[in-house]
From Swiss-Prot:
Pathway membership: Amino-acid biosynthesis; L-methionine biosynthesis via salvage pathway; S-methyl-5-thio-alpha-D-ribose 1-phosphate from S-methyl-5'-thioadenosine (hydrolase route): step 1/2
Domain of life: Bacteria
Organism lineage: Bacteria, Bacillati, Bacillota, Bacilli, Bacillales
Gene, per the UniProt record: mtnN
Positions with a binding annotation for substrate: G78, M153, M174, E175
GO molecular function, one term: adenosylhomocysteine nucleosidase activity
Name of this protein: 5'-methylthioadenosine/S-adenosylhomocysteine nucleosidase
Organism in which the protein naturally occurs: Bacillus mycoides (strain KBAB4) (Bacillus weihenstephanensis)
InterPro entries: MTA_SAH_Nsdase, Nucleoside_phosphorylase_d, Nucleoside_phosphorylase_sf
Amino acid sequence: MRIAVIGAMEEEVRILRDKLEQAETETVAGCEFTKGLLAGHEVILLKSGIGKVNAAMSTTILLEKYKPEKVINTGSAGGFHHSLNVGDVVISTEVRHHDVDVTAFNYEYGQVPGMPPGFKADEALVALAEKCMQAEENIQVVKGMIATGDSFMSDPNRVAAIRDKFEDLYAVEMEAAAVAQVCHQYEVPFVIIRALSDIAGKESNVSFDQFLDQAALHSTNFIVKVLEELK
């Protein structure tokens, strides 16, 4: 099976890249694509760059040029739910934009005109990720909504404003909704699997620097387990 894995930063893709066999890397429009073999699958590992525009552009190139059957977006995120801690893993059930507001024209908050209010992750991929998480003893793994915006959420006031909009939000980051929207338009199944590098609003910038590598390791190990179980 041909599976694409997307991470925004070098720290988020380095470990998985080192695990690929027969790896070949090429750069297209500033985006790094590495093809290789892992767990019996042909894997295309994309380093997309940070933010929604980079994520949307690179995911479009990925789907047009490499035509993966499924897409997994991995990396770090900021925890939003009160039950979460740094290092925990969140599996998306749904992804939304938290910085889109066209409510003046009767759209839901976060809804892009012409698109659904949120983008549902593939149920089979979510179920598979849930199955893999049952073996995790030292890391809390949960599933829920992830929201995306082009801002790092270190301001408590902004965090509070987003909490008011999305009561069931588990994590925030800067690429997933763009990846999900492109996958939705191409009708390619996707899931987002993110490990928490910080808790949004609680000295997030300090925590992010300290725990990015830990989050990257947790998310990568989880991705490998999913690939091993994927048939």
